[in-house]
Amino acid sequence: MALLEDVILTDSIEIKTTPEKIFNFLANLVDDESYRAWHSDDHLALRWIKGQPWEEGSVVYAEEYIHGKLHKLKFVVTKVIPNREIEYAPVSWLLRRYFPKNTFSVEQKEGTCVFIATGTYRLGWLVKTFAKKRLERGLSSVKKHMKEEGENLKRILEEEGSPHNNSMDSGKQ
């Protein structure tokens, strides 16, 4: 039996947009206001403390609510394939052991894209055995948060493309 086992949470949503517009949205997550616009119920603060947004080696600090608790997170961007994939991981080596990576990826389809959010968690048998209910609640909350982020991204980008709403088109290209 392995000491730690990977649990991978994934959420995907089809969006009527282009990979470039999805990545442009992510690239424009630069401050509290832009971060809250993505998920106003849970996102509180965001700032890039090293490098440029979503460039390999850049570090971002974020505050958000997950399962009703405030989390203060610091991530390093570990991989970027423009318009296809962003991978990021906790800065802390200790946290990285249990939360090794998260990804945002985009698969282009005919006329649409699929936005995929993935979180990888490493769990030990002790946690899975003795804290099963708490673990299930925590993972369920993370999955819900991921789903809401995808739904919000879809709403924002599809409304942006409609002729009656260009509120997100701030000229930041």
In which residue ranges do the predicted regions lie?
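Short, surface-exposed coil-to-beta transition loops
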Residues: 8-10, 70-75, 97-102
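Generic structural detector for well-ordered beta-strands
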Residues: 12-16, 76, 105
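Beta-strand/loop substructures that line and gate deep hydrophobic ligand-binding cavities in soluble
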Residues: 89-144, 164
